């Protein structure tokens, strides 16, 4: 089974968590694209979706799935999204696709976070994948200096502007032993919009595509 086939299996497995007549929170990325394809097969049974990125919005609209603004929605039963890394406590690094702020907002609204990944994303300790930090442009250099003080090696992601009009610093060489603490520390830096640690609001259910099928894990 190829990596993409494992992503597809995880994406389709998430369909069973979608409630009829509900509005579904939808994330961003290659694994989520498979979930969107799956969601399109039951678009007549759901009210629509809230999207965390322009890319996902365009794909869903092209498939005929109604997309709502989050401000017009009172309730999201589930949010389905991928991760760049996830540990056994359901803490994640996300934001490789630069949609981390909107992803974090939609995740905060949802009652249940379903994380879909292939088995290469499971790690013991977060930090091998660089941690994305969304930054207001004028604060880029200042924030980078503060991130160095935290032990990181920030690199400006050239040519990338987020859907919110901001820039991304990718922070390398962080060994993240306390994800919740580091998430708070980075978010307290003036000029940071948010960072890609999803520890305060981690996943509730993890669906992992493996060569032996999809494995399900739930948060304790």
Curated annotation (Swiss-Prot):
Binding site for substrate: 28-31, 81-84, 94-97, 121
EC number(s) on file: 5.3.1.6
SUPFAM superfamilies: D-ribose-5-phosphate isomerase (RpiA), lid domain, NagB/RpiA/CoA transferase-like
Keywords: Isomerase
Pathway where it operates: Carbohydrate degradation; pentose phosphate pathway; D-ribose 5-phosphate from D-ribulose 5-phosphate (non-oxidative stage): step 1/1
Protein purpose: Catalyzes the reversible conversion of ribose-5-phosphate to ribulose 5-phosphate.
HAMAP family recorded: Rib_5P_isom_A
NCBIfam families cross-referenced by the UniProt entry: PRK00702.1 (NF001924), rpiA (TIGR00021)
Name of this chain's protein: Ribose-5-phosphate isomerase A
Organism: Shewanella baltica (strain OS155 / ATCC BAA-1091)
Gene name as annotated: rpiA
């Amino acid at each position: 089974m190829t990596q993409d086939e494992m992503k597809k299996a995880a994406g389709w497995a998430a369909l069973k968590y979608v409630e009829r007549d509900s509005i579904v929170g939808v994330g961003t990325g290659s694994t989520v694209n498979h979930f969107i394809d799956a969601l399109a097969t039951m678009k007549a049974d759901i009210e629509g979706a809230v999207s965390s990125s322009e890319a996902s919005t365009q794909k869903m609209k092209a498939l005929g799935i109604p997309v709502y603004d989050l401000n017009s929605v009172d309730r999201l039963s589930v949010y389905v999204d991928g991760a760049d890394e996830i540990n056994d406590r359901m803490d994640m690094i996300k934001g490789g696709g630069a949609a981390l702020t909107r992803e974090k907002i939609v995740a905060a609204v949802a009652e249940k976070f379903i994380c879909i990944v292939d088995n290469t994303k499971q790690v013991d300790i977060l930090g091998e994948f660089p941690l994305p930090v969304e930054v207001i442009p004028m604060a880029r250099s200042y924030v980078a200096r503060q991130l160095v003080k935290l032990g990181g090696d920030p690199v400006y992601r050239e040519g990338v502007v987020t859907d919110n009009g901001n820039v991304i610093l990718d922070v390398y060489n962080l060994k993240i032993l306390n994800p919740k603490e580091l998430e708070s520390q980075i978010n307290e830096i003036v000029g940071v919009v948010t960072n890609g640690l999803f520890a305060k609001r981690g996943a509730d259910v993890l669906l992992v595509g493996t060569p032996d099928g999809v494995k399900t894990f739930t948060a304790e």
